[in-house]
Amino acid sequence: QLGTPISSLMAWTEILKETYPKDDLIPEMDKDVKRLQLIADRFSKIGSQPELVPSSLNQIMDHVFDYMDRRTSQSIKIMKEMPVHDLIVTINASLFEWVIENLAKNAVDAMGGKAGVITLHVEEEAGKAVIEVSDTGKGIKKKDIGNVFRPGFTTKKRGWGLGLSLARRIVEEYHHGKICVKSSEVGKGTTFRIELKL
C-alpha cells in the first residue's frame, strides 16, 4: 500500500534532478525517499518469517553510524567501539539495522536537544555477539524500565510508542536473541543491550 506514493515521490525527485541539476538539496531528498522505500520494505517483512543470512555486524554498525552521524546535531558526538575482527551473525540485515537505528534515534531524543555522547559498542562474549547502545541523556525512571518494551509506552509528546516493542519482536522472535535495558540512571543516561548467538 505504501509502494504507490513512494514510487510517485521517486518519480518527482527524478524530475527535480533533471530540472535543477545543480541543486544540492535534491540528492539528499533522493536519499531520504530511497530510505523510505527501504523502511517500507522492512515493514512488509513483519508478520512473515524474514530470511536470515550470515551478515557482517561491523558493516551494519558502520551503516547506522554513518546515517546517524550525518543527521545528528554537531553537539551530539556518536562513537563506535568495534572489535578488530569482523563478527558474522545470522540475521536479516535490513530489519536488524532498523533496530540499532531505532535505539540510536531514541538516544538522540533522550538528549533533549542538549550536548551529549552516544556510543555504539560491539564485542564478542562467551560465544555471543553483544551490541550496546549507550547515551548520556535524561535516563529512564526506575518505575518505567519494566514498561519500555510494552506497545504504546512512550514518554515522548509525539509518536505511538511502538519502536521498542517492535525492536524486541525483531530481536527475540525473529533472531532468537535478547534485548534489555542494561542500565539507566535519571540525569546520567541509558544503555540498551542486545545479545545474539554467533
What is each residue range found by the language model?
Residues 8, 23-75:
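Conserved DHp (HisKA) dimerization/phosphotransfer helix of two-component histidine kinases, i.e.
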Residues 77-88:
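Conserved catalytic submotifs in the C-terminal HATPase_c
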Residues 135:
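Acidic ATP/Mg2+-coordinating residue in the GHKL
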Residues 140-151:
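Short conserved segment of the HATPase_c
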Residues 171-172:
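Detector for a conserved hydrophobic position within an alpha-helical segment of the HATPase_c
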